[in-house]
Amino acid sequence: MANEVRVARLESLIKDVINNALANEINDKIAKLARVTAVRLSNDLSVAKIFLDAHKRESMPKVLENVNKVSGLLRSKLAAEWTSYKVPELRFVIDETIDYANHIDELFKKIKQQEN
């Protein structure tokens, strides 16, 4: 397994390159709505799981679909910056963290209301 510092640096590079490409180099207006919130590399660095979010949560399925359509271009942008042996396969997923945090907030509000 690659050391933690190297993995963190590579994950940060992927996040920066993909966010920059989505914001500045992609012509797809729907894909431009996406923002990378986190990246997790596999132990062998062959797969990058990229977590996406968009301002309008209800548009995420369409955003994810369009980002997947331009994934080849995104991977080529990453290849230009990549310093390791092989550019990882990019797998895009919807980041559920915000939904989970909102759910937890709602639970806390219900508990607080029940206490009053």
Swiss-Prot record:
Where primarily located? cytoplasm
Q: Which GO terms describe its biological process?
A: maturation of SSU-rRNA
Q: Which domain of life is it from?
A: Bacteria
Tell me which Gene3D superfamilies the record gives: 3.30.300.20
Subunit comment for this entry? Monomer. Binds 30S ribosomal subunits, but not 50S ribosomal subunits or 70S ribosomes.
Q: What HAMAP family does UniProt report for this protein, alphabetically?
A: RbfA
Q: Which NCBIfam families would you find in this protein's record?
A: rbfA
Protein name in UniProt: Ribosome-binding factor A
Q: Which organism is it from?
A: Ureaplasma urealyticum serovar 10 (strain ATCC 33699 / Western)
Task: Point out the gene that encodes the protein.
Answer: rbfA
